[in-house]
Amino acid sequence: MKFNVLSLFAPWAKMDERNFKDQEKEDLVSITAPKLDDGAREFEVSSNEAASPYNAAFQTIFGSYEPGMKTTRELIDTYRNLMNNYEVDNAVSEIVSDAIVYEDDTEVVALNLDKSKFSPKIKNMMLDEFSDVLNHLSFQRKGSDHFRRWYVDSRIFFHKIIDPKRPKEGIKELRRLDPRQVQYVREIITETEAGTKIVKGYKEYFIYDTAHESYACDGRMYEAGTKIKIPKAAVVYAHSGLVDCCGKNIIGYLHRAVKPANQLKLLEDAVVIYRITRAPDRRVWYVDTGNMPARKAAEHMQHVMNTMKNRVVYDASTGKIKNQQHNMSMTEDYWLQRRDGKAVTEVDTLPGADNTGNMEDIRWFRQALYMALRVPLSRIPQDQQGGVMFDSGTSITRDELTFAKFIRELQHKFEEVFLDPLKTNLLLKGIITEDEWNDEINNIKIEFHRDSYFAELKEAEILERRINMLTMAEPFIGKYISHRTAMKDILQMTDEEIEQEAKQIEEESKEARFQDPDQEQEDF
């Protein structure tokens, strides 16, 4: 698809075109397109149509019918509406606070290049560029906000803004885009060989819908609802990695919680309604209409009802009791006719319910919500408002260990927010080449800071267990197993650590303060 590209995207368009030419040179032909599970809308375009500005992809994307964008917009709106439920918000806050940890004098996230083969000079330059990326994201202050948006929306986009005249200066700003207005597109370029379609390559880009905004660029005025093609290299894109059953749309981690969250909210509202309607004694009016004709009796009933009417309604959106139209009825009197002079008009009461203290249903749905979000049930706020008991980490449950693994999985998928702009800066400034980056990408590690208190508890517990094992094995050390084996297998020390500790022990043995006091008295 070829049409005018805005001047601010020109450097990125050249970069994408260069990558596509490199792809053509490799001549990697297949019978199927790559399955990347990244939510891109794929269009099959022949090699001849790829050069046409009005191919099938153009007509589909720029037409009035956009099922893909509508589905994405509805999904994100659904996830955001869930956050209005305080139960969902509390559970998501547990996930975000474990993934992004703020502590004094520590970096929220750091770059580890220890296993990479870059020279020390290159490593220092990469660390400086990584700091610039964090500054552009304001991650030290807004890291949890970025992670929360990514988790809730299931995706996050940043526009990499550079100076088109001086691209070697790198990224100037990372500007977040509305994920509901961005669409990821992949054109699959095919050729026909012996009646069979062969995939020759693919092109990727983003389509941004300006929605209700209008803007001016390159001396032209663009009205609201304009669709803009953005080169893939100009956008940072990180997604959840989860796809729906058809494998075409990205869904969020909140997708599993939609049903239990709505059921919990419905049940909580139903409990309020039930308690207000059944807890108080309701009035029962027996209106004596005597031998009145049916029409007169109905008019008399209506007159008494309008005079003595008592109606209370409950607004589920605010949780308030009020009396307005279009609200769910709560308490209302019963009105019954009496004839033939059996009794005069009287007011009686209907006893209220006596089982309104049962909350087991709400607790069950709350547990279902936390299980859907993979948050340990031990983190559900308890009715007693009790605190958390710490006992040197010995009470760490399997759920907490599973939750820690889940947090690491989320952090790993969120890493693209740092790696993509870092790679862009390194390439624009000529610090490394793209081949060097691809060769070392598996050795470039993003380390998220963990809660130091729990980390220390875990390390102390592990060390305590190793020392206890060493104490039990002490009678056999030197007889059945060697000291070196005990240090490596029981204390889990490496060869370097063993040599280092041996030298340190030898040096300390020469200092008086580290010698045995009893031995010193004997020598004296």
Swiss-Prot record:
GO terms for biological process: symbiont genome ejection through host cell envelope, contractile tail mechanism; viral genome packaging; viral release from host cell. Residues 500-524 are annotated as: Disordered. InterPro entries: Portal_Gp20. It is found in: Virion; Host cell inner membrane. Residues 500-516 have a biased composition (Basic and acidic residues). The keyword Coiled coil applies. Residues 486-516 form a coiled coil. Its main location: virion. Keywords: Capsid protein, Coiled coil, Host cell inner membrane, Host cell membrane, Host membrane, Membrane, Viral capsid assembly, Viral contractile tail ejection system, Viral genome ejection through host cell envelope, Viral genome packaging, Viral penetration into host cytoplasm, Viral release from host cell, Virion, Virus entry into host cell. The keyword GTP-binding does not apply. One of its GO terms (cellular component) is viral portal complex. Belongs to the Tevenvirinae portal protein family. Forms the portal vertex of the capsid. This portal plays critical roles in head assembly, genome packaging, neck/tail attachment, and genome ejection. The portal protein multimerizes as a single ring-shaped homododecamer arranged around a central channel. Binds to the terminase subunits to form the packaging machine. Attaches to the host inner membrane most likely through interaction with host yidC and forms together with chaperone gp40 an initiator complex to form the prohead. HAMAP family: PORTAL_T4 (MF_04114). Homododecamer. Interacts with the large terminase subunit. Interacts with the major capsid protein. Interacts with the capsid vertex protein. This is Portal protein. It comes from Enterobacteria phage T4. The gene is 20.
